[in-house]
C-alpha cells in the first residue's frame, strides 16, 4: 500500500490540473500560433511559467485504484499488474483470461 500522503499529493495535482486546464491551453495556443507577435508569445510564456508547477498534467502519476502502487499500472483497468492478475484469476474481469500457446 502506498503512503497516504503520496496518494493525496497526486489527488491535489489532479485537481490543480483540472482547475488550470483551460488557462494553460489558452496560453499554449498563443505560444504555438505562428501569426501571433513575438511580444504576445513572450508574455504568454511568462504567464505560463507563473502558473503553479503542479497544475501541469505531466506531473501526475498513474496509480493503482486499489493499492495506490505507482509502478506497473495498466491504464486500461486502472489497476497495477498484480491486482489485474489477481482479479483475472478470480474471473472478475470479463473477457480476460490467462494466455496459453
From Swiss-Prot:
Name of this protein: Small ribosomal subunit protein uS14
Source organism: Haemophilus ducreyi (strain 35000HP / ATCC 700724)
Keyword Ribosomal protein: yes
Gene Ontology annotations of biological process type: translation
A GO cellular-component term linked to this record: cytoplasm
Function: Binds 16S rRNA, required for the assembly of 30S particles and may also be responsible for determining the conformation of the 16S rRNA at the A site.
InterPro entries found in the cross-reference section: Ribosomal_uS14 (IPR001209), Ribosomal_uS14_bac/plastid (IPR023036), Ribosomal_uS14_CS (IPR018271)
Regions that span the bilayer: none
SUPFAM superfamilies in UniProt: Glucocorticoid receptor-like (DNA-binding domain)
Keywords on record: Ribonucleoprotein, Ribosomal protein, RNA-binding, rRNA-binding
Tree of life domain: Bacteria
Subunit field text: Part of the 30S ribosomal subunit. Contacts proteins S3 and S10.
Recorded family membership: Belongs to the universal ribosomal protein uS14 family.
Molecular-function annotations in GO: rRNA binding; structural constituent of ribosome
Pfam families reported for this sequence: Ribosomal_S14 (PF00253)
